[in-house]
Amino acid sequence: MNRTYLQKYLKTNSSIQWLYMKYMQYYAKKFLNHPETWKQWQLAKLTAMLSYAQRHCTYYRKYIVGEVRMDNSMEIIKSLPLLDKNIIRHQEKNVYSDEITDNWKVWLNTGGSTGEPLHFPALYKGLPVEGVCQMMLYMKMGYQWGDIIVSFDGCRIKDEDRSRNIYWQMGNANFPFGKKNFSTLYLDNNSVKYYWEELKRTKPAFIRGYPSGIMEMCKLAMNTGIVMDLKLKGVYLTSESFTQDEKNFISSYFKCPVYGQYGHTESSIFAIQNPADEVYYCSPIYGYTEVVDQKGQHVNIGEQGEVVVTGFVEYGLPFIRYKTGDLAIYGGETELGETILTKLLGREVDCIYNKGGKKIYLVGFIFRSE
């Protein structure tokens, strides 16, 4: 089940949507019920990724020598050089999988909040762990079959719709990104009531999306006297930085727990922040996460370093020891294999302001597949 197939059919084929949801629920339950398997899964996937890169990427053949096995993959990964956007741009096809053809159609753009965006080919293989980790988070928040999810993001709404006070559009599928996508671009004192009217009609169990947009909607609703009568199970903040105070405010307003999620388009890290604090736990199911100093050496607990990731999702361009550009305080590792980020320090630039002082969220302009 690769990304190309899902992008094409999840929006229009209800049978595919249903099967995908059931598939994700099955594996999410399996991992949640057996967390003792996470570290072994991570080791197996790391071994598979290194072996694949050795066989299919010219760039890695000179660095990965000899047989890659589960008993030596950790030693191998620590010996490899760090990868960054400049190396990728310079190497191009050498670092791409040899399965990527000249007429490859599925390409993605990375975020540019900590640097210039990167354009790379997308190729999934095996279990879609992105969906599994998303489902694990929703189930942690109490997800049940039939619960509605809506998102707040930077989608652009047609002029015709906005003239009729419609500031949302239908999503690709309810899970994981929302049945309806509410745009953060048009929120103001005049439009907020229409957002709330549609939210009440939709009756979501979960809201996910940009923290700043969700915060702004809450504040505008309070300022205009709108009564909050949604019955939410949880709010899921992603794509932007936010503070614990902002998370607490959203939780207090919606009267539900608020979780944070940290990741990248490179599909190499999926980290969860619980409601009570700012600590992130990086899933060993999704990838292998390090925090390194300027020399590429792993920092000690309590020290600051750059988040470096090796993903288990993206094979078109294997992101192995990839420098994210984000800084974090390293907090060690849980017994389940989760890398702990005590505090995430990256992503300072999430928005700009137009001449009228209106926030324009950068993420909506960057994260777009072709």
Question: For each predicted feature, which ranges?
Answer:
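Hydrophobic transmembrane signal anchors and adjacent membrane-proximal interface regions, especially
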Residues: G66-M70, R164-M170, L362-F367
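Active-site glycine/GP-rich loop and adjacent strand/helix microenvironment
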Residues: M1-E36, A44, S51, N174-E370
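Short secondary-structure capping/turn micro-motifs that flank functional sites
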Residues: R69-M70, G154-C155, M215, E266-S267
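Nucleotide 5′-phosphate-binding alpha/beta core
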Residues: M1-N109, E116-G131, M135-I148, C155, ...
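Alpha-helix boundary/capping detector
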Residues: N86, M136-L137, E160, R164, ...
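Short Asp/Glu-rich motifs
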Residues: E130, D161, F270
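Mobile, glycine- and charge-enriched loop segments
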Residues: F120, D147-D188
